[in-house]
């Protein structure tokens, strides 16, 4: 049976998103590195989703999973390269196929992402 989400609950989550974007996320350089664009957010969520689900993901897979309406393939790959330069992700060579390089978030990015999610889900304060 599906859980019914009330308008009040949606309002609460929306307020947490606003507070989170204006406080935690606005001052967290790790999260800011992904830009607050649609494709930047999708890149971040793809990386973190693959990490938490223990499913390796490549830059190409990320680029192919994001609709061209959000950003060009080149823009997506460049943002991933920037995240690597900023030491927010590392690339690990696949053991089964040396041509494949999987993207893995660093501890700093994992910490920032968990802080952001924890705040949005009302698990922690802004401080």
Question: Residues of each region from the PLM?
Answer:
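N-terminal leader/capping segments at the start of a protein or of a new domain
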Residues: 1-18
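Short, cationic-aromatic polyanion-contact patches
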Residues: 94-117
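Short amphipathic alpha-helical interaction segments
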Residues: 70-85
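Short helix-to-turn junction characteristic of helix-turn-helix DNA-binding domains
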Residues: 47-51
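Amphipathic alpha-helical dimerization/coiled-coil segments
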Residues: 114-127
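A short, conserved structural fragment
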Residues: 84-94
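Short acidic, hydrophobic short linear motifs in intrinsically disordered regions
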Residues: 53-66
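Short alpha-helical segments that sit at the start of domains
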Residues: 17-46
């Amino acid at each position: 049976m599906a859980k019914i989400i009330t308008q009040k609950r949606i309002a609460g989550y929306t307020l947490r998103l606003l507070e989170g974007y204006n406080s935690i996320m606005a001052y967290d350089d790790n999260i800011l590195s992904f830009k607050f664009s649609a494709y930047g957010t999708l890149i971040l969520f793809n990386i973190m989703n693959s990490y938490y689900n223990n499913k390796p993901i490549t830059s190409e897979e990320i680029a192919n999973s994001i609709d061209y309406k959000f950003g060009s393939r080149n823009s997506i790959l460049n943002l991933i390269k920037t995240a690597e330069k900023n030491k927010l992700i590392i690339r690990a060579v696949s053991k089964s196929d040396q041509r494949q390089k999987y993207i893995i978030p660093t501890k700093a990015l994992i910490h920032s992402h968990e802080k952001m999610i924890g705040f949005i889900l009302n698990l922690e304060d802004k401080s």
